[in-house]
From Swiss-Prot:
Mn(2+) 2 binds at residues 311, 343, 392, 467. One of its GO terms (cellular component) is cytosol. TPR repeats are required for the binding with phytochromes. This is Serine/threonine-protein phosphatase 5. The lineage of its organism: Eukaryota, Viridiplantae, Streptophyta, Embryophyta, Tracheophyta. Binds 2 manganese ions per subunit. GO terms for biological process: chloroplast-nucleus signaling pathway; negative regulation of chlorophyll biosynthetic process; nucleocytoplasmic transport; red or far-red light signaling pathway. Mn(2+) 1 binds at residues 282, 284, 311. The active site is at residue 344. Isoform 2 dephosphorylates phosphorylated phytochromes, with a preference toward Pfr forms, and enhances phytochrome-mediated photoresponses, probably by enhancing their stability and their binding affinity for light signal transducers such as NDPK2. Can use para-nitrophenylphosphate (pNPP) as substrate. The gene is PAPP5.
Length: 538
């Protein structure tokens, strides 16, 4: 028999759940989590509360926490299909398709007449089949050839069916062939074969002259050098939703590859006395917000350098425009822009969150492989003037890591699931001291004491990282020793957050934080190119 206090707790828990639901509807997912937590504290035997909190964690990309909460919902009520549903969705978002499939099969068993469950199960089955196929045909890493080394952008231009080879050149070739025939003497059939071969061969060679089609009206690179005028024209074309010729896209990516290949895994940046550098966080395919950053803070140049701290692509549907713009500035002047790898510069993320599909749609399949290769060359971290450590994710599961250890990382690979490289890309700060499990399910959470020891051990003053949405575009934590900066305002067109960037001026290197709001963009929704099964859960 329930007591009066127990009835009161259940009633108050329902009130908190209702408030949490309203916060969720308003895209205030952190507030929703806090309110669901209060409901759980009053009544932990309600599976709905756990499943709802799991959904809110999923919205914040905290998939590890979502899986924990959904598992708790299942523990409370093994017949509650939403628990399996929420856990399966979190597994999908992490790319753990086989685990997701098991959960959706259970959803189908519990709700056999639910058309939505049937549809999602089919999509998950397709994803698992595709994964098995890719595993079956994959080439071992040791046997893979560089995609970049198979591409010569100079030969990319006119196609044979649209050759612009001048007619007089073809006629000249025919005349020469006739003279040979007259001198040597051939039968009629042989003469025809010679003439046809000459004409077709002339046009075929013309098609590989490397000249860009005359009807192409977009930005052009003259020769080998990427200039500021070209980059400005290209950005204006992108702004107007025009495309860049594949020849120039190849040229930009291949030249960037050569620059990145020569860099160490940890790059030291020197900012002269009286000069500055701007650090930006995640931009996630939000090209029009990137243009706004340049409008507010100036274009990248040797006098106005930027460091973009990873997660250039995915989520937003203008990732191709973002990456070509950043790479073009790197080609134009390598010291005008520094680029760090984020957890989304990886095959596993790009398959799920839209970049791979967008590249396939806007460029070609070969570019998918090329970007995957070049992303492996991006540095993992930067140190500015020996004082500011900048990394996408965060710190490590062990103490005593030195900058020399980071420099020694062999980064030319897909991110592993554990170790220093994984933690640099995936870890997050936590308010409590020490270390804890990652709310994402990858990496770890680290406290202010961990930050303090790392900075002291390496004679550093500040840790700047990105990787997390913040309402104001930034957050200062760990007694002022850690700053999170996030530069994608109104993330995914729904979070309502501001964006931010940080300017550091030498010699004092004090952070000057600038915030900004989202700007309009064409009516292309985030995740427009993402896998269909993932879009169903967003």
């Amino acid at each position: 028999m329930e007591t009066k206090n127990e009835n009161s707790d259940v009633s108050r828990a329902e009130e908190f759940k209702s408030q949490a639901n309203e916060a969720f509807k308003g895209h205030k997912y952190s507030s929703a989590i806090d309110l669901y937590t209060k409901a759980i504290e009053l009544n932990s035997n309600n599976a709905v509360y756990w499943a709802n909190r799991a959904f809110a964690h999923t919205k914040l990309e905290e998939y590890g926490s979502a899986i924990q909460d959904a598992s708790k919902a299942i523990e409370v009520d093994s017949r509650y299909s939403k628990g399996y549903y929420r856990r399966g969705a979190a597994y999908l978002a992490m790319g753990k398709f086989k685990d997701a499939l098991k959960d959706f099969q259970q959803v189908k068993r519990l709700s056999p007449n639910d058309p939505d469950a049937t549809r999602k199960l089919k999509e998950c089955e397709k994803a698992v089949m595709k994964l098995k196929f890719e595993e079956a045909i994959s080439v071992p890493v040791s046997e893979r050839r560089s995609v970049a080394e198979s591409i010569d952008f100079h030969t990319i231009g006119n196609k044979p069916r649209s050759s612009s080879m001048p007619t007089k050149t073809a006629l000249a070739a025919v005349v020469a062939a006739v003279m040979v025939v007259a001198v040597r003497g051939f039968a009629t059939t042989e003469i025809l074969m010679v003439l046809v071969s000459v004409v077709l061969g002339t046009f075929w060679w013309g098609s590989f002259s490397g000249k860009v089609e005359p009807q192409y009206s977009g930005a052009r690179i003259e020769g080998e050098e990427v200039t500021l005028d070209f980059v400005k024209t290209m950005m204006e074309d992108f702004k107007n939703q025009k495309t860049l010729h594949k020849r120039y896209a190849y040229q930009i990516v291949l030249q960037t590859r050569q620059i990145l290949l020569a860099l160490p895994s940890l790059v030291d940046i020197s900012v002269p006395h009286g000069k500055h550098i701007t650090v930006c966080g995640d931009v996630h395919g939000q090209f029009y917000d990137l243009l706004n950053i340049f409008e507010l803070n100036g274009l990248p140049s040797e006098e106005n350098p930027y460091l973009f701290n990873g997660d250039f692509v995915d989520r937003g549907s203008f990732s191709v425009e973002i990456i070509l713009t950043l790479f073009a500035f790197k080609c134009m002047c390598p010291s005008s822009i520094y680029l760090a790898r984020g957890n989304h510069e990886s095959k596993s993320m790009n398959k799920i969150y839209g970049f791979e599909g967008e590249v396939r749609s806007k460029l070609s399949e070969k570019f998918v492989d090329l970007f995957a290769e070049v992303f492996c060359y991006l540095p993992l971290a930067h140190v500015i003037n020996g004082k500011v450590f900048v990394v996408h994710g965060g710190l490590f599961s062990v103490d005593g890591v030195k900058l020399s250890d980071i420099r020694a990382i062999d980064r030319f690979c897909e991110p592993p699931e554990e170790g220093l490289m994984c933690e640099l890309l995936w870890s997050d700060p936590q308010p409590l001291p020490g270390r804890g499990p990652s709310k994402r399910g990858v990496g770890l959470s680290f406290g202010g004491d961990v930050t303090k020891r790392f900075l002291q051990d390496n004679n550093l003053d500040l840790l700047v990282r990105s990787h997390e949405v913040k309402d104001e575009g930034y957050e200062v934590e760990h007694d002022g020793k850690l700053i999170t900066v996030f530069s994608a305002p109104n993330y995914c067109d729904q979070m309502g957050n501001k964006g931010a960037f940080i300017r550091f001026e030498a010699p004092d290197m004090k952070p000057n934080i600038v915030t900004f709001s989202a700007v309009p963009h064409p009516d292309v929704k985030p995740m427009a190119y993402a896998n269909n099964f993932l879009r169903m859960f967003n």
